[in-house]
């Protein structure tokens, strides 16, 4: 009866003077592991144009059917290829963050980023379109999110 009580107190006193395990979350953020799969990001090439060629392989590879894509003919201002994604949407309520879209992309246009703050106030905000997924044009492709391009 007294033995378990002593064991419990010894464990408590052992951890009492160690540094805390918890993190003050809004002020401090824990760095993500290299293989962490967060919010998807659409990449740009070295000229600042979109990399997506609208092949639709990401949409086909998605087991949750979370990616919707509409292709359109390109005039050379959006990207270098003949087609581009006129509509590109990812439904976050369906996405299971498996990374199959990243693996299926032949031109490395989409990858899983490190962003994990995905909370929104409205259900409609869970559908992210191309403008919300595209990397800003000023960021160099090789240094985006610390990831190398293929």
Can you annotate each of these PLM segments?
Residues 1-103, 107-150:
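Non-ligating segments of multi-cofactor redox enzymes
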């Amino acid at each position: 009866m007294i033995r378990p009580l002593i064991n419990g107190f010894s464990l408590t006193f052992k951890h009492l003077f160690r540094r805390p395990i918890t993190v003050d979350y809004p002020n401090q953020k824990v760095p993500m592991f290299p293989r962490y799969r967060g919010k998807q990001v659409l990449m740009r090439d070295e000229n600042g144009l979109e990399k997506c060629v609208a092949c639709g392989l990401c949409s086909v590879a998605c087991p949750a059917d979370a990616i919707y894509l509409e292709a359109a003919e390109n005039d050379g201002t959006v990207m270098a290829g003949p087609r581009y994604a006129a509509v590109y949407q990812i439904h976050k309520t369906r996405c299971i963050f498996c990374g199959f879209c990243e693996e299926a992309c032949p031109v490395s246009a989409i990858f899983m980023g490190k962003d994990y703050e995905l909370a929104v106030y409205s259900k409609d905000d869970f559908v992210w379109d191309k403008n919300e997924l595209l990397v800003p044009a000023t960021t160099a492709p090789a240094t985006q999110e610390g990831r190398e391009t293929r």
